[in-house]
Amino acid sequence: MSQFSFTKMHGLGNSYIYVNMFEEQIPEEDLALVAEKVSNINTGIGADGMILICPSDVAPVKMRMFNNDGSEGKSCGNGLRCVAKYAYEHKLVEETVFTIETLAGIVTAEVTVEDGVVTLAKIDMGAPRLTRAEIPMLGESETPFIRENFLYNNHRYAFTAVSMGNPHAVIFVDDVEKAPLTTLGPVLETHEMFPERVNVEFIEILNEDEMNFRVWERGSGVTQACGTGACAAVVAAILNGKMERGKEITVHLAGGDLMIAWTEEGNVLMKGPAEVICRGVYEYKIEA
């Protein structure tokens, strides 16, 4: 029987099991299965996935994120805020502004601290990637995918594809509560046009400063929040002429609110909370 200490944290209800790999050891070949096991709500701890906080050669810490189906993702906005909180509070970093390595690249985090506790984290998510090759999507590699139609169940849905280090398909609807989240979501996620699958967001524009947001996450299904998805949604809204670039937009997710801005300089900034749920020790056995 093997075991490791963990901290369960969430960003707006998007929860992961966080493991400090400065102190713990999980064999590389076991990571996918362990992520699947520990995320199981019935036989594990229950979460949207597992995130490892690892040493890095190019930043103070590195984040590795695994979905609850065991697949490894390149980035996670809510996860990054929680990693920033953990790293500062556990003295893996000393400054309130620092970098985090991800499979999608290096991002900059800035934490707001009150009495030694991180209450808010802002992440510079970098510039969005808009060409089919960068997302990735099939088709002309240098061509963006903006407001293109997808026929599903005799209804045409126009979506815009954006990568924030991971792929997103953003669809604008009149009412997110009536959006076909659990039906169209998995169909688009696994569609052949997305070789690495895709996250699917349904967006309802409320006014020039606010939007409602619901998400079907690649590898996890319906979740309470998706930080990279909120960033992609704001970028898509601006590309479609629905919002202004340079303004801070409030994104209302099922789990709470994020503040997102696509700056004139080109990067996307995400600001929101990160909270600890519980800590403990997880025991597991990998069958031969």
UniProtKB/Swiss-Prot annotation:
Gene3D superfamilies from the UniProt entry: Diaminopimelate Epimerase, Chain A, domain 1
Listed PROSITE patterns: DAP_EPIMERASE
GO biological process, one term: lysine biosynthetic process via diaminopimelate
Residues at the active site: 76 (proton donor), 226 (proton acceptor)
Reaction(s) the record says it catalyses: (2S,6S)-2,6-diaminopimelate = meso-2,6-diaminopimelate
Domain of life (superkingdom): Bacteria
GO function terms (MF aspect): diaminopimelate epimerase activity
Protein keywords: Amino-acid biosynthesis, Cytoplasm, Isomerase, Lysine biosynthesis
Keyword rRNA processing tagged: no
Function: Catalyzes the stereoinversion of LL-2,6-diaminopimelate (L,L-DAP) to meso-diaminopimelate (meso-DAP), a precursor of L-lysine and an essential component of the bacterial peptidoglycan.
UniProt subunit comment: Homodimer.
Name listed for the protein in its UniProt record: Diaminopimelate epimerase
Species whose genome carries this gene: Bacillus cereus (strain ATCC 14579 / DSM 31 / CCUG 7414 / JCM 2152 / NBRC 15305 / NCIMB 9373 / NCTC 2599 / NRRL B-3711)
